[in-house]
């Protein structure tokens, strides 16, 4: 039975590959991410890696998670506004070190290997969901994974509130469902990136992801 399930998983992944649903990304990088448009608009993705000399000053939140100190005022303001609407949220993930990012990617790869995929295929499949070290916004400290507190607010309620309101505080959903072919990351309703209020408003109004917005500047 276990072997049968593994075969089904491998077959399912192959069918998704053939249908174009899975987008494989490479571990190799092309350029260092640029700050030409400001620190808040640094584009980090599979072709723009974080420069080796990039420094971030972190602030620890009440729950122990860390973020870039510059986003704390707007992040706090957003959470206060949510509470006024009876939406109680928390930052589930903030800043990550390169080591932590590598560990998460390795764990995801090992999971797919345990399901019967060869190492190379498992890694490439994992990269659809986990960024390689140096290409994760979590290493900038500008990205936060936000969830409901599980006491008064469900994750879905938090996601709905963020979808409607996050841009007012300078945050945007970084990996929208309809932008996967551009971001090369599957939809993540919990992952929000600070870009500043001006950019967030324009991205919200024009339905742009960060790649599209930076290209338009």
Regions found by a protein language model. Name each.
Residues 2-217:
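Extracytoplasmic cell-surface/polysaccharide-interacting catalytic and binding patches
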């Amino acid at each position: 039975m276990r072997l049968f399930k593994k075969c089904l998983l491998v077959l399912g992944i192959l069918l998704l590959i053939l249908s174009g649903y899975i987008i494989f990304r490479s571990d190799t990088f092309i350029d260092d991410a640029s700050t030409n448009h400001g620190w808040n608009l640094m584009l980090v993705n599979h072709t723009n890696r974080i420069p080796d000399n990039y420094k971030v000053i972190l602030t620890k939140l009440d729950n122990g998670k860390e973020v870039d100190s510059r986003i704390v005022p707007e992040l706090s303001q957003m959470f206060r506004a949510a509470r006024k609407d009876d939406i109680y949220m928390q930052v589930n993930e903030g800043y990550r070190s390169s080591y932590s990012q590598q560990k998460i990617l390795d764990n995801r790869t090992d999971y797919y290997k345990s399901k019967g995929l060869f190492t190379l295929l498992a890694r490439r499949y994992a990269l659809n969901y986990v960024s390689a070290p140096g290409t994760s916004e979590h290493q900038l400290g500008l990205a936060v994974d936000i969830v409901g507190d599980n006491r008064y607010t469900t994750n879905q309620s938090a996601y709905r509130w963020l979808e409607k309101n996050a841009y007012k505080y300078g945050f945007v959903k970084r990996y929208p469902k309809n932008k996967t072919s551009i971001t090369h990351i599957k939809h993540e309703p919990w992952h929000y990136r600070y870009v500043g209020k001006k950019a967030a408003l324009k991205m919200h109004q024009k339905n742009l992801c960060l790649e599209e917005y930076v290209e338009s500047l």
